[in-house]
A protein has these predicted regions:
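N-terminal subdomain of nucleotide-sugar transferases
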Residues: 2-65, 253-255
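A short helix/loop element that forms part of the nucleotide-sugar donor recognition site in Leloir-type
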Residues: 12, 210-224
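Conserved donor-binding/catalytic core segment of Leloir-type glycosyltransferases
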Residues: 25-27, 181, 225-241, 247-250
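Membrane-proximal helix-turn-helix segments that form the acceptor-binding/catalytic region
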Residues: 44, 103-110, 125, 132-133, ...
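Donor nucleotide-sugar binding/catalytic pocket of nucleotide-sugar-dependent glycosyltransferases
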Residues: 60, 75-76, 159-213
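Nucleotide-activated donor-binding/catalytic signature segment of Leloir-type glycosyltransferases, i.e.
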Residues: 266, 274-300
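Acidic donor-binding loop of glycosyltransferase active sites
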Residues: 301-318, 331
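Conserved acidic donor-binding segment of nucleotide-sugar-dependent glycosyltransferases
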Residues: 347-358, 366-372
Length: 407
C-alpha cells in the first residue's frame, strides 16, 4: 500500500475522519500507469483534475509506473501479492486484485473526509454495496459494458453468466448518482436507465510534429522502404478489436497495392497469430510488422509515418481511445461503421465500412491510391479534433462533472 502522510483524526457520523479533507476518492481496478486504453483515459482524468486544483486519492492495483501530479496521492492495494502484470480483459489475477482493493478503500473512507467517490468499471459494484457505511455520492466511470466485453469469453460468455453480468450492470447504472461513459455508450446506458444522469467522454487527441530524421529512423528500424505505403493499427489485440479482420483485408490490399506494409502496434503475445493463415502469408511477403506495445510518446511517431490509420473494432458499444489520437494526427482513417465510431466520425472525417475484410481492404486501397482524398479526410478529422476534442474542453468537462459531484 502506498505510504501517505499521517493526519490528525476526529469523529464524524461515528467514524474517524481526517481534519484535512481530500475532495475526491478514485477507485480504479487497473494497472496504473500503463500505456493502454483505460489507464491512459484515467491519467487524462487525473491530470485534468490536478490542473483544476482538485485533491485526489487514488486506490489502484500494485502494478504500474509511478505517476506524480500535484494534489494526487496513490494507494496501491495488494502489493504483497506475487502479481506483477495484469493482462487485458478478464483473468483470475484481476479478480484477486479487485478484492485486494476493498480493505484499502475501507481504510481511506475511514481516514479521510471525501466529497464524493469516482469509481471505474467493476469497482462501482462494491462502492455501491458499501454505501450504507460511507453515504457518499458516486460517479461511475463506465469505460465499457462488461457483458459486451466478456461476450467472447468461453465461460462468462455463456448465457447464464451473461444474464448475471447484465443484472449487475443494470443495478450499478441505476444506483450510481452520475455516470460518465466512453463515447458511444450513452444510448446503451439510457436503454437500461432512461432517467440516468449520463455523460460521454470525448478525450483530447494530441499531435506533435516530427523531424524527418525521427521518422526516417523509425522506418529504418521497421525495415520499411521510403516509398512504401504504411497502414497502421495501434491498440491491444483482443478479439473484439477485429485484428484478424484487418489481416484478411491486408492480403487484398497488398495484392492491389504491392509494397504496402501493415504495422500493428500493441502485440503482447507473439504467438497470438501463429495459426493465422493471413498473418503467415503477409510475413512471407514481408508485408507485416508486429510491434510490442509502445510508450504513448512514440505512438505519435508511428502515426507520423502512416499513410492510413485503421480501427477494425467490433461493435461492443464503446469507442477505442486510439480514435481520438488518430483524429489529432491528421491522417486518413478507415474504421468499421459502428455507433461508437460514429460518436466522433462521419463520412467527412473517415471512411466508415461494414465489418467485412473486403470492405475494409477496398477502403484502404482507395486511400493509398488517392492521396488527395486522404488528405482531405485527415485534415477534416484534425480540424474537428482541434475544435471539439482539445485539452481545454476536456478539462472543463472534468470541472463541470466534479462540480456536480459536489452537490
Amino acid at each position: 500500500m502506498g505510504a501517505a502522510e499521517e493526519t490528525p483524526l476526529t469523529m464524524e457520523h461515528g467514524l474517524p475522519v481526517s481534519l484535512h479533507s481530500r475532495a475526491i476518492l478514485v477507485v480504479a481496478p487497473q494497472p496504473f500507469y500503463e500505456n493502454r486504453g483505460t489507464p491512459i483515459a484515467l491519467r487524462n482524468v487525473l491530470e485534468a483534475a490536478s490542473q483544476r486544483g482538485y485533491e485526489v486519492d487514488l486506490v489502484t492495483f500494485p502494478v504500474g509506473e509511478p505517476v506524480k501530479l500535484p494534489g494526487l496521492r496513490i494507494f496501491r492495494a495488494g502489493a504483497w501479492l506475487p502479481i506483477r502484470n495484469v493482462p487485458i480483459g478478464f483473468s483470475i489475477r484481476k479478480v484477486i486484485l479487485d478484492f485486494s482493493l476493498l480493505p484499502v478503500f475501507l481504510k481511506r473512507i475511514r481516514s479521510e473526509k471525501y466529497e464524493f467517490i469516482y469509481a471505474l468499471e467493476e469497482a462501482a459494484f462494491f462502492v455501491l454495496l458499501l454505501r450504507r457505511w460511507h453515504k457518499l455520492p458516486l460517479i461511475y466511470d463506465m469505460q465499457s459494458s462488461l457483458p459486451e466485453q466478456l461476450k467472447a469469453h468461453p465461460v462468462l460468455g455463456l448465457s447464464v453468466f451473461q444474464r448475471l453480468l447484465r443484472s449487475f450492470e443494470r443495478w450499478m447504472v441505476r444506483k450510481a448518482d452520475r455516470i460518465v461513459c466512453s463515447a458511444g455508450l450513452r444510448k446503451h446506458v439510457l436503454s437500461i436507465a432512461p432517467s440516468a444522469d449520463v455523460r460521454e467522454w470525448f478525450f483530447p487527441g494530441t499531435r506533435r510534429e516530427f523531424l524527418a530524421g525521427e521518422t526516417d529512423h523509425l522506418r529504418k528500424e521497421l525495415g520499411i522502404d521510403p516509398d512504401s505505403g504504411v497502414v497502421l493499427y495501434t491498440g491491444n489485440f483482443e478479439p473484439y478489436q477485429g485484428v484478424e479482420r484487418l489481416l484478411d483485408a491486408a492480403l487484398n490490399v497488398v495484392a492491389e497495392v504491392p509494397g504496402t506494409i501493415f504495422v500493428l502496434v500493441g502485440d503482447e503475445t507473439p504467438s497470438r497469430f501463429s495459426r493465422s493463415k493471413s498473418a503467415a502469408l503477409l510475413r512471407e511477403q514481408g508485408s507485416l510488422r508486429l510491434v510490442p506495445r509502445q510508450p504513448k510518446s512514440k505512438i505519435n511517431c508511428f502515426m507520423a509515418i502512416a499513410d492510413v490509420l485503421v480501427s477494425p473494432r467490433d461493435d461492443i458499444g464503446n469507442i477505442g481511445i486510439k480514435i481520438f489520437e488518430y483524429m489529432g494526427a491528421g491522417k486518413p482513417i478507415v474504421a468499421t461503421d459502428t455507433p461508437s465510431h460514429r460518436a466522433v466520425l462521419d463520412e467527412t472525417r473517415a471512411i466508415l465500412v461494414d465489418l467485412s475484410p473486403e470492405a475494409m481492404g477496398s477502403a484502404i486501397v482507395r486511400l493509398l491510391r488517392d492521396r488527395a482524398a486522404g488528405k482531405r479526410l485527415g485534415d477534416s478529422a484534425r480540424s474537428y479534433a482541434g475544435k471539439h476534442l482539445g485539452w481545454k474542453s476536456f478539462a472543463d468537462g472534468i470541472a463541470d462533472l466534479y462540480a456536480l459531484g459536489r452537490k
